[in-house]
Amino acid sequence: MFKSLKPLVLAALLCAAAGSQAAITVYTNQADFLAAVSAPGYDNYDDLVVDLYDSPLARTAGVYGYEAASPSGLYGAGTGTDHWLSTNAPLDPIVFQNFTGGVSAFGGYFFASDIAGGYVPSGNLVLTADDGSTLTYTLTGATQNSFLGFVSDATLDTVTLATDGGAYWPTANDVVLAVPEPATYGMLLAGLGFVGAVTRRRHS
């Protein structure tokens, strides 16, 4: 009986894992996003100056590493002491990529800026998360307080930030990278423990 049950348990766990890889949840509230993740790391871009930067640009957010890339280069935007990350060309996207540390959650404040790097109100931004599957979300009328976050059941490959083709530049501020809340793995670990119990019983 237990011998025949073990393959069924393994199959159920594998099916659950396969199904979870396609699940990306969108958050538009930072507090809700942070409640769904663990060990967040932040990058506020305040070390950037208003100038052109080569692409890709290596960055860190807490213990996590990542790159920001754009075809025509990146641009440090912002005013005063509050600096942001943008692109050199308005139609170019920012691609956040090559995450380290098992990053499966990515969020931040996303809005539009002008040719001088100043804030443009009510821009429309399009963000796409890719973890093997893709999910696209449009921020309409984005402001400096427009938060968007993706939480995946799998590690993220890329997150892309672009405009809808308007005469403004895609801009990011205060991005946060994280891993899943430990409870995300609870059912899987419990299932694996059950497989271990089945194995021990079969050999006893």
Language-model regions: role of each:
Residues 201-204:
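Short, charged juxtamembrane terminal tails flanking transmembrane helices
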Residues 17-19:
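N-terminal signal peptide c-region/cleavage motif recognized by signal peptidases
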Residues 181-199:
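A short, hydrophobic C-terminal helix/tail in secreted or cell-surface proteins
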Residues 23-178:
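Surface-exposed, well-ordered secondary-structure segments
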Residues 1, 22-23:
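Absolute protein N-terminus
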Residues 1-8:
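Bacterial N-terminal signal peptides that target proteins for export
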